[in-house]
Every structure is written in structure tokens, then in C-alpha cells.
Amino acid sequence: MKFEKIHNKGQAQLFRHPALEMLTKAHPLVIWGMYLPVIIGLPLYAAMNLHLTALRLTAFFIIGMLFWTLFEYLMHRFAFHYIAESKRAQKFIYIMHGNHHHYPRDKERLFMPPLPSLILAILIFGLQFLLLGNNSFAFFPGFVLGYLMYGSMHYAIHAWNPPFKWMKPLWRNHHLHHYKDEERGFGVSSTIWDQVFGTMFDLKKEKEDKAKVQELMFEKKKIS
């Protein structure tokens, strides 16, 4: 997936019908509002009704969060950057991720929209329940919190400079993924798997192109 030009204004039109187009957008707070009850409610249900211990709940919750980072990496690398031959597959990949490379300043498409997000969440929870049984009531909330942290980190990378020095590699890794090489730097919430699988940028050698980085940042509202 290669895009020769970054569009700095507006957003991609994914569907002709305005109702469908609206369903492709999401505000971060809406997504957090949808999933916070799940993150809190499922472990409470498991503790009160399934008699899972606090230690077990905590362990599977943390494992779920950590598993998200691997899931994020694999999806980004092998699904969202898959070189498809069919037009339908190309369109699907563009809807899922390609439009973000084309319009990196689009704030409304950094999180998956509510409806497809809920459908996918139900399917993922069902699969995790089949594999993990009642442990999924802790694993899935951890997995979802990992997703919310990923989405929020992605938003922050395009909105602000890194607030702490130790976070700068995350920012630079993602910026370089956009403007230098789309086949590296797949981790957004973590660079661990880029380092494990050899797709990490050498940040000591790569010079930061401030002009290109600025093209990736959300436009700041001008105060009149």
C-alpha cells in the first residue's frame, strides 16, 4: 500500500451514501464511553457470579492487555498493509486503514466506528470465550483496554508532541512509518514487537524531517 501524496485537509469519502459515510466516523470519547462499562462490568460479574479470584482476574486482565499489543502489530502489518489484487479487497483495506495514510489529519477515523466495533468485539469475545472459558471475562476487558490505549496513543501522536522523553521513540516510530517506510514501524502503542520482528526503525540513524512530521499533525484551530 503506497500513497504518493498526503492530503492535509479534509477526509476521504469512503461511501457515497451520507448515512454510511457517517457510520465510518467516531469520537474517542464515544468509544471510551461504550467500552468502559465492559471493562469494569465483566470482571465484576466474573468475581460475583463465576467466583474468579482477584489474582486470577488480575492476571488474565494483564495478559489480555499484553496480548493486544501483539494483535495490534500483526493486524497492522499483515492485514492493513496487505497488498491485495482484487478491487474489493483493496477497497476494504483502504476503508480500514489506507485512508489514514492518505489523510493522517482526519481525527474522526482513528478509532473504529461504534457499529462495526461492537460487531467485531462480540465476535472476538465469543472466540476468546471458546478458548479461555470464564477467564475471558477478565482477558477480554484487558484486551479492550489495550485497544482503547492504542487508539488514544494514536490520537496523541497526531495531536501533540511527546509529553515525556521516554515516549519520543513511539512518536518517531509512527511518524517514520507514515513518511519514510510503510513496511516498518507497525507498533503504535508499543515498539516491542517491531524490535522482536526486526521492523523497528534505527532511531539513532534516522533524522527527523520536521516538515513532514508537521504534515501528520492535526491542524490547530486559529484564535481570531
Regions from the language model: what does each represent?
Residues 1-140, 152, 182-224:
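Non-catalytic, topology-defining segments of multipass membrane proteins
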Residues 144-151:
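Alpha-helical membrane-embedded segments
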Residues 157-170:
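Interfacial helix-loop-helix junctions of multi-pass membrane proteins
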Residues 170-176:
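Short, membrane-exposed interhelical loops at transmembrane-helix boundaries
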